[in-house]
Amino acid sequence: MKRKVMLTGDRPTGALHLGHYVGSVVNRLKFQEEYETYFIIADLHTLTTKPDLKSINTIPSNVREMVLDYLACGINPDKVSIYLQSAIPELFELHLIFSMIVTVARLQRIPSIKDMSIAAGLKEIPYGLLGYPVLMSADILMTKANLVPVGRDNESHIEFARELARRFNHLYKNNFFPIPESVFTDSRPLVGIYGKNKMSKSLDNAIFLNDDENLLEKKIMSMYTDPNRIRADIPGNVEGNPIFIYHSFFNSNHEEVEDLKSRYKKGKVGDVEVKKKLFLALNSFLKPIRDKRSFYEAKKKDYIDEIIFDGTSKARFIANKVVKDVKDLIGLSKTWNGIKYSAEKKLKNEE
């Protein structure tokens, strides 16, 4: 039986951190075993909020760093097609065709667009950002994805893609595009090391998967804990405490975690001990990832590029067929095909 197609991916922001691992990578390791999986490196989406040259110039190195971390975590390029969004020109065509059957009013009702604009510090919403859901729908429908992993706060984007697929199918009287389904990961964003905000490279509150032991220890020892606990003998709060959130995710010794929580709530253990044990647990978790990353870094220089090239070539082959079929279906191919046929026939007769 043919496996279902899944599309997932990231903007190329560089090396991955623990928030990425908890939020997406851990699920992707399962997905690659169950589905025909595509990873999109969404560099075009980067332009919707960061179209400046400085940001664009970071994309090549960010792409390679991100793919290195994919491999280090166990993503298998033999099971997953990793492709570069901007290298699929057919995607631009599909995006344009879709934009003709979408209203501005519908796009303005998507709440995340305004949120993205505010987060990027934009005074006005540019056309590209307003049309972000159309491009995302083109990403999804280009691969004829059946499944798309998504957090519940971004489900409106997948609902829009479903809407667009249904509208296209209805307008052109054909069930050409499958209706994509959301796969909810149910993972909350991992809080950054200073509390409050989620882990983010831009907020400088992240622990990266490739942080070495010294840097990892330095970051953990500086972590935010319970602000009301000024001495070790004062009972502390473990709920919402970043130290214990990290212990729950990354410390495989569950008995130790429960013991630390119990003593912390009674004021019988200090922050230093709790942090040191977190460092040992997290370093043990990250060491195989760092080692695997070093292994791939030591390979020939263009190894990562070959993986991206192969994945992009496969994605483009699929995209080319989809766009050709779409043009045939809506009748857009007729004019050019007629002109081409007449011209080629004339040339052949003249030979």
Swiss-Prot record:
Its EC number is 6.1.1.2. A motif ('KMSKS' region) lies at residues 198-202. The keyword Ligase applies. The keyword Membrane does not apply. It is found in: Cytoplasm. SUPFAM superfamilies: Nucleotidylyl transferase. ATP binds at residues 11-13, 19-20, 151-153, 190, 198-202. Catalyzes the attachment of tryptophan to tRNA(Trp). Belongs to the class-I aminoacyl-tRNA synthetase family. NCBIfam families: trpS. This is Tryptophan--tRNA ligase. It comes from Borreliella burgdorferi (strain ATCC 35210 / DSM 4680 / CIP 102532 / B31) (Borrelia burgdorferi).
